[in-house]
Amino acid sequence: MPPSLSHLFLLSTFASLALCSFYCKNPGYPCLNGGTCLYNGECNCTSGFRGFNCGLDSSTISAACTVECHNKGICFNGDKCYCTKDYMGPTCQQAYDFADCNKSSMKIKAYRPTEFNGEIFLMQSMFGCKLTEVTSTIPGYKQYELDVPHDSTGPCKLKKTIDATTGDVHFEVNVSTIHHAGQFGMYDGLKTVSCHYSSRDQAIVKDVTNHELLVSVTTSDGNTQNIQEIQTNDVIHLTFNPVNLPGGYKGVKILDLEMYSVQWNEVNSILLLKDQCMTQKADELGYSVSNEVDGYSGRAILKAIPLFENVQASVYFNYRLRFCRNRCKIKSCPSQSPKPMPMGEIFKHQGQGIRIV
Ligand SMILES: *[C@@H]1O[C@H](CO)[C@@H](O)[C@H](O)[C@H]1NC(C)=O
Ligand SMILES: *[C@@H]1O[C@H](CO)[C@@H](O)[C@H](O)[C@H]1NC(C)=O
Ligand SMILES: *[C@@H]1O[C@H](CO)[C@@H](O)[C@H](O)[C@H]1NC(C)=O
């Protein structure tokens, strides 16, 4: 019985700054605590205060902190975050400009101070691709949105790139802000927002909007018997078989392979293969893994040792595959050097668990 796989992409979204986003001459961007606004739009803070808008009292900066401030926010008073100019929220997790991504579209969103009275639009068209104001989900801010389908061919279309090696898909667009409707000034902003679709777990991504590639994963002993339970030192053959490989792709190889177990809501994880090579960690743990190329299917052979101490739960595999135009080449791996373990990763789907008894 092949394990069932979900077909979600891992999504991430980024916003990077291309032009200034804080300019104290713009309405809604004051210098605080007696700071003065300089000709160049930066604040000159009075002594004892710092930060882009002088909003941080230096004497309150905390070395020890009970909250985690994201995006280079600085902790003060032990549990508060002072955010950099592109982020807001209690722990600075909320960007002012960002994109919500799903499988079919990119929703570009922006928050602005209530005093903001300008316009936000995609750089390619000030008139045709304007973000419209919607009811704000954050009190004290205005909210703007524009939903652009991935396959849009109109003036608002997104820039799409596909990584030929990994199959990762990337959509990107530039968002302009003008603070005084109708005039673009040097103190207006430009940001790049993007959606990145990782092909991890997902095999090759030819087209995000039209993609249904299944990979069946089987765990077997050397005699092709499917196994559900193994003993220490048993050999496990893990086979990845794409069900509907697009034309032109003939080989499959395991790029990354991670073994994990969830017990009492804790994830124990070991990276077995990283960029096709066995990790130092794998070696330290005393088991072997090899990455075989077998034409149409990718195979890993593992030797089961007590993988996670004190863990009775089933073991699952998380993986990333590479699809090759022909038979995949065998990579010569460098001599092993220590590599960090993956941290706190959330697994999007699970292969069939094997119980190690
Ligand atoms: C900033 O303010 C201080 C006084 O608080 C002043 O001496 C200094 O010249 C100011 N800097 C600029 C660049 O205006
Ligand atoms: C997600 O997709 C639907 C169409 O299926 C679209 O209407 C919606 O706006 C999208 N949401 C986001 C956040 O992109
Ligand atoms: C966004 O703007 C930057 C800076 O002008 C430029 O390098 C980049 O190519 C632009 N990206 C898109 C998708 O237009």
Swiss-Prot record:
Disulfide bridge positions per record: 24-37, 31-43, 45-54, 65-75, 69-81, 83-92
Domain EGF-like intervals: 21-55, 61-93
InterPro entries linked: Dev_Signal_Modulators, EGF-like_dom
Localization annotation: Secreted
Major localization class: secreted
Any one of the GO CC terms: extracellular region
Keywords linked to the UniProt accession: Disulfide bond, EGF-like domain, Repeat, Secreted, Signal
Annotated signal peptide: 1-20
Top-rank lineage group of the source organism: Eukaryota
SMART domains hit by this protein: EGF
UniProt note on tissues of expression: Prismatic layer of shell (at protein level). Expressed primarily in the mantle with highest level in the mantle edge and lower level in the mantle pallium.
Molecular-function GO term, any one: signaling receptor binding
Protein name: EGF-like domain-containing protein 2
Organism: Pinctada maxima (Silver-lipped pearl oyster)
High-level lineage: Eukaryota, Metazoa, Spiralia, Lophotrochozoa, Mollusca
